[in-house]
């Protein structure tokens, strides 16, 4: 008698999922049965495809836990300025702001919607999108700018994410997921899969609309009327509408075709919106001051670790690497709160 347990142990569930992919996905979609595999071969999971397994490994990682404490754009540790003004020198954003973790969750949902509508591999798109920003430093743009300045050879959060998941906190992910994470940024060549392109487009849709929401909530923008008229004319008058319009545009211009792309009109207004967000939000004077504070804090901490490598957090880097790389890995893995506490401990101070 064959029991349900026997079916599970024999991999019947996974095999059925792989067969469903072969029947239902577009010819150009990635198929888990054809994955290029993992760095370290291991037995297949009996009930999950390889990319379902990767998604779970990313969600359950320590890096994902820390991502909840990393800034996306607004730095809670420096909050305080704005219509609801506090006293600490930054926009007051309360508890409802986007962190790296919530940004990755939102990106993953958008990527999954795109992949589903385009008959692509949803678990692969979800895994890439869920882990795409794990390599980001604390303090948002300021943290990355600091590490770019001090790290030998510069710092790239996309490459750092792949390094993190391969070497520092190895999850033995598939080649396709690591490729999508390492190449999700628009400054890199496109990822090797269309599912990676879903994650890349979803990232931009998610961060622009979420950062707009945070800017409105913090009072950095007086209202949606501040957004350029041409953007509102195409995308609508609130961030939720904007997400829907942008997602439907990608589907309309990609469905039934071996590519994932936007239409010209939406691509143009996204460029306009991105320029607007840099001018009015990311590079506004207060944001620049916060960025400089973050850069100074992390630059100080980097120098301290070069002089006192024994004070670096244990397990955050590889002992065989040069001390400069160890310091970069240690700092890149920190949450905002941990970095601030480490700086205070290193310099016996209580304010930045």
Tell me the role of every PLM-derived stretch.
Residues 106:
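Conserved N-terminal alpha-helix of the aminotransferase class I/II PLP-enzyme fold
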Residues 126-131, 135, 201-202:
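Short alpha-helix carrying the canonical HExxH Zn2+-binding catalytic motif
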Residues 140-152:
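A glycine- and small-aliphatic-rich helix-loop capping segment at beta-alpha/alpha-beta transitions
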Residues 1-101, 109-114, 120-122, 143, ...:
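Histidine-centered, transition-metal-coordinating active-site segments
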Residues 131, 148-149, 318:
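Conserved short loop/turn motifs at secondary-structure junctions
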Residues 134-139, 206:
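Short active-site segment of divalent metal-dependent hydrolases/proteases
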């Amino acid at each position: 008698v064959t029991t349900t347990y026997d079916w599970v142990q024999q991999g019947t569930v996974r095999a059925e999922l792989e067969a469903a992919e072969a029947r239902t996905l577009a010819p150009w979609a990635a198929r888990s049965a054809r994955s290029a595999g993992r760095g370290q071969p291991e037995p297949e999971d009996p009930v999950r495809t390889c990319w379902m397994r990767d998604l779970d490994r990313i969600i359950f990682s320590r890096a994902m836990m820390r991502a909840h404490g990393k800034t996306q754009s607004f730095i809670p540790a420096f909050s305080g300025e704005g219509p609801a003004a506090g006293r600490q020198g930054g926009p007051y954003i309360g508890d409802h702001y986007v962190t790296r973790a919530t940004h990755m969750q939102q990106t993953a949902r958008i990527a999954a919607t795109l992949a589903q509508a385009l008959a692509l591999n949803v678990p692969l798109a979800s895994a890439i999108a869920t882990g795409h920003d794990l390599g980001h430093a604390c303090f948002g743009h300021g943290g990355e700018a600091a590490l770019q300045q001090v790290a030998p050879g510069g710092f790239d959060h996309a490459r750092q994410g792949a390094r993190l998941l391969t070497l520092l906190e190895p999850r033995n992910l598939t080649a396709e997921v690591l490729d999508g994470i390492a190449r999700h940024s628009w400054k890199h060549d496109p990822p090797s899969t269309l599912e990676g392109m879903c994650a890349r487009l979803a990232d931009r849709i998610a961060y622009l609309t979420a950062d707009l929401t945070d800017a409105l909530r913090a009072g950095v923008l007086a209202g949606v009327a501040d957004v350029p008229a041409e953007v509102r004319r195409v995308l609508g008058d609130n961030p939720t509408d904007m997400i829907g319009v942008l997602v439907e545009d990608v589907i309309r211009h990609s469905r039934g075709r071996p590519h994932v792309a936007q239409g010209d009109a939406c691509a143009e207004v996204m460029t306009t919106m991105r320029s607007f967000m840099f001018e009015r939000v990311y590079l506004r004077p207060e944001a620049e001051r916060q960025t400089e504070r973050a850069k100074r804090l992390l630059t100080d901490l980097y120098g301290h670790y070069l002089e006192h490598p024994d004070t670096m957090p244990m397990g955050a880097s590889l002992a065989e690497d040069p001390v400069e790389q160890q310091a970069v890995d240690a700092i890149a893995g920190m949450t905002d709160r941990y970095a601030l506490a480490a700086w205070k401990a290193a310099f016996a101070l209580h304010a930045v």
